[in-house]
């Protein structure tokens, strides 16, 4: 009698139990044609059904400055680092935000702050 209720609860909370992508390290370096942003992510990729699928660079006001798509799972490469070059960061900003996502859970709720050295 209680088994259907328990099964329904487990199914309803399954995605909430999944681990979100975590920014392990990040830096932004100025260059001749914009900034290069390097982000190291950790995520328990399981394969094509659940993997870290990208990250975005945001201004403090939430405006998107860049997006790095991750096109395949990194099951055996954790954590892993990817770069995005040519990011135009407006003068006057002292930091940007990095927000990763995964194919199952979407965007993480709290982005990671990266201070800029100009």
What are these language model-derived features?
Residues 1-8:
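Sec-dependent signal peptide recognition
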Residues 66-106:
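Short, solvent-exposed, Trp/other aromatic-anchored flexible loops in extracytoplasmic proteins
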